Amino acid sequence: MTVQMEYEKDVKVAALDGKKIAVIGYGSQGHAHAQNLRDSGRDVIIGVRPGKSFDKAKEDGFDTYTVAEATKLADVIMILAPDEIQQELYEAEIAPNLEAGNAVGFAHGFNIHFEFIKVPADVDVFMCAPKGPGHLVRRTYEEGFGVPALYAVYQDATGNAKNIAMDWCKGVGAARVGLLETTYKEETEEDLFGEQAVLCGGLTALIEAGFEVLTEAGYAPELAYFEVLHEMKLIVDLIYEGGFKKMRQSISNTAEYGDYVSGPRVITEQVKENMKAVLADIQNGKFANDFVNDYKAGRPKLTAYREQAANLEIEKVGAELRKAMPFVGKNDDDAFKIYN
């Protein structure tokens, strides 16, 4: 299915005019949405639990409240807390304070699509999902453009939900560079698949496997790190800028020939079948339930996975090598530390 890119000129209704907006959560996405909307002339308050994020929101000049108080005051409530805590936050502090005609928004469809959160039928449910981390959403807005976004409507109680979604996307700067309409189902399942099979899970597993093959064959770990991890950014940047074509035009003929000959030997039809199994677990809710149940149990699986990952040899080798490369990791100031 082909979708049409939309821009600021396509946002016909200033649906957020006169609305009080509550951004719930002040982390990576929360600070970016809130600051961009404020700079776009919107009336924004913050709802967040006491702690560092609460203090940071006040320091950044926002009227800051508890989640319950912010919900009571607002017409439009955007929930930007981490996926795993949204259900309990919604049930305890947001749901009791919603009114008919309110709009509730999300930047990811996880809790709505898998029905961990059920919003009353007289409340709009929309989505604005920028395709980039919060610090990039903020930085590009300040530079005069933005990050593309997906928007969707799950529930249109007032007849105005799509206008709210599009105007929100405009307010955070996304409509400057392009909007794509989607559904909660499509955004949620595709986003999770991309993260698990390619961008995060697939990529890190591929890098680690390559590192192990080289070191087990007797090659120096430091050299293996450069070959399978450090140079990854250089290749990905070329693909990002101009697709596979630009990457292949930029590498040597030797590398290009090896790409065609050996790539299919690594990513086989069996790997594709494994990817289909990953997608199936996303579609049928197995992954979502496993993730939420692990959180409710105190995160034993996630904690174990993190400990295992931290002890990988490639991580230890990389940490030492990066000390000699002060230019690595200096591209986006310290926004990650501030808002995470």
Swiss-Prot record:
Catalytic activity: (2R)-2,3-dihydroxy-3-methylbutanoate + NADP(+) = (2S)-2-acetolactate + NADPH + H(+); (2R,3R)-2,3-dihydroxy-3-methylpentanoate + NADP(+) = (S)-2-ethyl-2-hydroxy-3-oxobutanoate + NADPH + H(+)
Note on how the cofactor is bound: Binds 2 magnesium ions per subunit.
InterPro entries: 6-PGluconate_DH-like_C_sf, KARI, KARI_C, KARI_N, KARI_prok, NAD(P)-bd_dom_sf
Pathway: Amino-acid biosynthesis; L-isoleucine biosynthesis; L-isoleucine from 2-oxobutanoate: step 2/4; Amino-acid biosynthesis; L-valine biosynthesis; L-valine from pyruvate: step 2/4
Residues that coordinate or bind Mg(2+) 2: D191, E227, E231
Record's GO cellular component terms: cytosol
Cofactor(s) needed by this chain: Mg(2+)
Location of the KARI N-terminal Rossmann domain: 3-182
Binding site for Mg(2+) 1: D191, E195
Family (UniProt): Belongs to the ketol-acid reductoisomerase family.
NCBIfam families cross-referenced by the UniProt entry: ilvC, PRK05479.1, PRK13403.1
Functional description taken from the UniProt entry: Involved in the biosynthesis of branched-chain amino acids (BCAA). Catalyzes an alkyl-migration followed by a ketol-acid reduction of (S)-2-acetolactate (S2AL) to yield (R)-2,3-dihydroxy-isovalerate. In the isomerase reaction, S2AL is rearranged via a Mg-dependent methyl migration to produce 3-hydroxy-3-methyl-2-ketobutyrate (HMKB). In the reductase reaction, this 2-ketoacid undergoes a metal-dependent reduction by NADPH to yield (R)-2,3-dihydroxy-isovalerate.
HAMAP family linked to this entry: IlvC
Name of the molecule in the record: Ketol-acid reductoisomerase (NADP(+))
Organism: Streptococcus pneumoniae serotype 2 (strain D39 / NCTC 7466)
Annotated gene: ilvC
